[in-house]
């Protein structure tokens, strides 16, 4: 009996230290990545491990980091128009979108709608695993609050664009621009940026180089939203250009 208690005590001790260590690493990551390029994300690690487990040792998950000044303003505008139009104003969470998603999901449980902001998506992609669970969502909330507190909006957008997945093994807008359009991210047109943003909900299902009718329709919707937001002026007014 004593040995069992001692074992449980040791398990609790090391488990607690492990949790504290992970939290410390996350905090350090938030501070470091406020200034330095993010070399890899949890999504990249997942994809890399998945490739190795299937015997694909040629697969290399990486992104070609570029600063915001080397990314077309249309790309920043497109992802905000598509994913998070209130990005410049909220503190990491869009309460209205959350309430709308909850209401929709109660009525239609077969087609679940998300309400994650760009800040939440960035926190998840950099620090957390993929999937749906209350534990992961709770951690996402804490990490989102952390990056909103430490990072600028421009920094969050820069990190997001550099680690977002645009296709199988294609991470970051620079790699996507060169792979799909044979040009650097700085030269992307409004139409090209909207097409890249259109596949972001599921880049392994939706294809930039073979867009379905849905993707084309979404691209056109994003272009209209970009115009309604005010185009490049929207970025300038919110110091995101």
Swiss-Prot record:
Give the highest taxon in the source lineage: Bacteria
Q: Where in the cell is it found?
A: Cell inner membrane
An example molecular function term from Gene Ontology annotations: pentosyltransferase activity
Q: Which organism is it from?
A: Yersinia pseudotuberculosis serotype O:3 (strain YPIII)
* EC number in record: 2.4.99.28
Look up keyword Signal and say if it applies.
no
Q: Which Pfam families match?
A: Transgly
Q: What is this protein called in UniProt?
A: Biosynthetic peptidoglycan transglycosylase
Which family is this protein grouped under?
A: Belongs to the glycosyltransferase 51 family.
> What pathway does the UniProt record associate with this protein?
Cell wall biogenesis; peptidoglycan biosynthesis
Q: Which gene encodes it?
A: mtgA
Q: What class of enzyme is it?
A: transferase
Q: Which NCBIfam families match?
A: mono_pep_trsgly
The topology of this chain with respect to the membrane is: Single-pass membrane protein
Its chief place of residence is membrane
Q: Which HAMAP family match?
A: PGT_MtgA (MF_00766)
What's an example GO BP annotation here? regulation of cell shape
Cellular component aspect of the GO annotation: peptidoglycan-based cell wall; plasma membrane
Function description: Peptidoglycan polymerase that catalyzes glycan chain elongation from lipid-linked precursors.
Keyword hit for Transmembrane: yes
Keywords, in A-Z order = Cell inner membrane, Cell membrane, Cell shape, Cell wall biogenesis/degradation, Glycosyltransferase, Membrane, Peptidoglycan synthesis, Transferase, Transmembrane, Transmembrane helix
Q: Record's InterPro entries? A: Glyco_trans_51 (IPR001264), Lysozyme-like_dom_sf (IPR023346), PBP_transglycosylase (IPR036950), Pep_trsgly (IPR011812)
Q: Which reaction does it catalyse?
A: [GlcNAc-(1->4)-Mur2Ac(oyl-L-Ala-gamma-D-Glu-L-Lys-D-Ala-D-Ala)](n)-di-trans,octa-cis-undecaprenyl diphosphate + beta-D-GlcNAc-(1->4)-Mur2Ac(oyl-L-Ala-gamma-D-Glu-L-Lys-D-Ala-D-Ala)-di-trans,octa-cis-undecaprenyl diphosphate = [GlcNAc-(1->4)-Mur2Ac(oyl-L-Ala-gamma-D-Glu-L-Lys-D-Ala-D-Ala)](n+1)-di-trans,octa-cis-undecaprenyl diphosphate + di-trans,octa-cis-undecaprenyl diphosphate + H(+)
